[in-house]
Amino acid sequence: MSDEKIINQPQDVVSEMLDGLTYAYGDLIEKVPDFEIIQRKSPKSGKVALVSGGGSGHKPAHAGFVGEGMLSAAVCGAIFTSPTPDQIYEAIKSADEGAGVLLIIKNYLGDVMNFEMAREMAEMEEIKVEQIIVDDDIAVENSLYTQGRRGVAGTVLVHKILGAAAHQEASLDEIKDLADKVVKNIKTIGLALSAATVPEVGKPGFVLDDNEIEYGVGIHSEPGYRREKMKTSYELATELVGKLKEEFKFEAGQKYGILVNGMGATPLMEQFIFMNDVAKLLTEENIEILFKKVGNYMTSIDMAGLSLTMIKLEDDQWLKNLNEDVKTISWG
């Protein structure tokens, strides 16, 4: 895969990307002056605010999910680099509508540390803040930037379910309680055919041999759990569904939602073929799939690959929240 990119200067990638995003979708979002923060343009409504974010390079996450029914604001760090506590604190202040703020944090050491520092800063200003840490990646227990499991594409489903609850005027305590329950029921596993290339580095994060894949690669090119020769889509789906089955311990009649997420360079054609194979495998398990989504929701710049997320729908309201209409750029 070519390392050439349509950019100007590598150090300007994030700021210019956000400027382009707000120019294109200025009816929905705006940039907080002097900060790499995207927030809703709609008037404040007095509801609980949801703030998420992290290093850039995962678009449309998280800025693409800012809007009515999802996030109030997204904090955008440098490529694959956690935003600073000051950035996050600014996002909390800007998003707060008086009912409190819930932080949705992917489980990476830098993100957790900086979001928690920002939370302390906000609480000193008497802003009510709660947080939830998303750790849906079942591939590995510890990684380069993580203690415990990583937070990956399942985070987007957390945005959606909690965003609907906030829109329905749930309290901060109610949304925090919901978050704790939802996160325990979301699990993700992925694979890569090629690594991401960070613009300022100029070379892939890892190298695979021709016709080789790696299972369990992280969204920052962290190592997975096995490499092997390329397989058919059905064989790849068998591997990922099998791992999720071990985690969830499928039982007939259980209700689930699924998300097939592209990592940045895998065409939708291939994602839909993979989804078809996942559907065949899950049909054999006699479980009900009540929510399905395919597309690029949390990418890794130009990585070729995909991930499969499943959410066990333990409450019918979760499904209703997933299906609620939103006004965002990228939920679709």
UniProtKB/Swiss-Prot annotation:
Q: InterPro entries, per this entry?
A: DhaK_1 (IPR012736), DhaK_dom (IPR004006), Dihydroxyacetone_Kinase (IPR050861)
Binding annotation for dihydroxyacetone: G55, S56, G57, H58, K106, D111
The alphabetical list of record keywords is: Glycerol metabolism, Kinase, Transferase
Supply the induction statement. Answer: Induced by dihydroxyacetone via the DhaQ-DhaS complex.
**In the record, what terms sit under GO molecular function?**
glycerone kinase activity; phosphoenolpyruvate-glycerone phosphotransferase activity
Spell out the PANTHER family in the cross-references: TRIOKINASE/FMN CYCLASE, TRIOKINASE_FMN CYCLASE
Q: What is this protein called?
A: PTS-dependent dihydroxyacetone kinase, dihydroxyacetone-binding subunit DhaK
